[in-house]
Amino acid sequence: MINLIKDSGNRREFKTGAVRDMAEGKGRMDLLPWSAIIEVSKHCENGAKKYGEHNVDKGIPTSSLCDSAARHLAKYLAGHTDEDHLLASAWNLLWALEMRNKHPEMVNTPWVDDIADKE
């Protein structure tokens, strides 16, 4: 086990006099919309029941995830209430980001390649 505390050399001091390493660039977890994240986690739970746990971790092309996200968003905007389309859209977009970050081989946006070829 690595027993190392990373240090940027920058400090922030609290009213109490305590100091910590600056958090800039590390992400602000305190700014996340937790009620929405809980909704997404329940959508993950339901998906695990249908497809098995960690099915999406095997890899889904980003084009499929973005297509589904756009379709769900269009249905949400059109007023469809047969399922939570806004939630489903968010889930698909989050997993597209996850594929980009952890499975770059799943990133397949042919329309981007087509545009780049024309420039």
Describe the predicted segments one by one.
Residues 1-119:
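Intrinsically disordered, low-complexity regulatory regions
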